[in-house]
Amino acid sequence: MAGKGKGAKAAAKKRLEAQKLLADNRQARHQYEILDTLETGIELLGTEVKAIRAGKANLRDGFCLIRQGQLQLHNVHIAGHEQASRYFNHEPLRVRRLLAHRREIDKLRGQLDTKGLTLIPLNIHLKGSWIKLTIGLGKGRKLHDKRQEERRKQDQKDLRSALKRL
């Protein structure tokens, strides 16, 4: 019986490691109102995988487009792998293909026809041994929307702290 307890803990630890967050675009949720999300695969080179696992990815200026029926990730900087030479390293800002089902891409294309919507990379994470990218369908926020959202969050924080004091 004692062996089963250790196995369960090890399995839980393994599951947590399998869902590890590798890069996050925190500013995206501030600048955009996220209406829908989609988890996609990402086509990477070997040195890109090693660099992402080392935490060398920057999603801040990234965006996604649908070109020729394929999802593409643009303007995401993945730094070169330190152990690789310049000859074997990848180009940091290259266009990367995203892997999604045709029906998901068609659904996104239909939603993107609405004016003002865009696809933004939200985070890169591990799912098992696969690197996945979560993209969000977002609508840009105006300055007053950002202020209103900050005010709402501050009010909720104040309310929670007031309830704790009671």
Swiss-Prot record:
Chief location bin: cytoplasm
Name of one Pfam family that matches: SmpB
Keyword terms of this UniProt record: Cytoplasm, RNA-binding
GO (cellular component) term, any one: cytosol
Single GO MF annotation: RNA binding
Region of interest (Disordered), residue spans: 142-166
Source domain of life: Bacteria
Signal peptide stretch: none
Keyword Transit peptide recorded: no
PROSITE patterns linked to this entry: SSRP
Annotated Basic and acidic residues bias: 146-166
Keyword RNA-binding (UniProt): yes
GO biological process terms on file: trans-translation
InterPro entries, per database record: SmpB, SsrA-bd_prot, SsrA-bd_prot_CS
Record localization: Cytoplasm
Protein family: Belongs to the SmpB family.
Functional description taken from the UniProt entry: Required for rescue of stalled ribosomes mediated by trans-translation. Binds to transfer-messenger RNA (tmRNA), required for stable association of tmRNA with ribosomes. tmRNA and SmpB together mimic tRNA shape, replacing the anticodon stem-loop with SmpB. tmRNA is encoded by the ssrA gene; the 2 termini fold to resemble tRNA(Ala) and it encodes a 'tag peptide', a short internal open reading frame. During trans-translation Ala-aminoacylated tmRNA acts like a tRNA, entering the A-site of stalled ribosomes, displacing the stalled mRNA.
Protein's name in the database: SsrA-binding protein
Designated gene of the protein: smpB
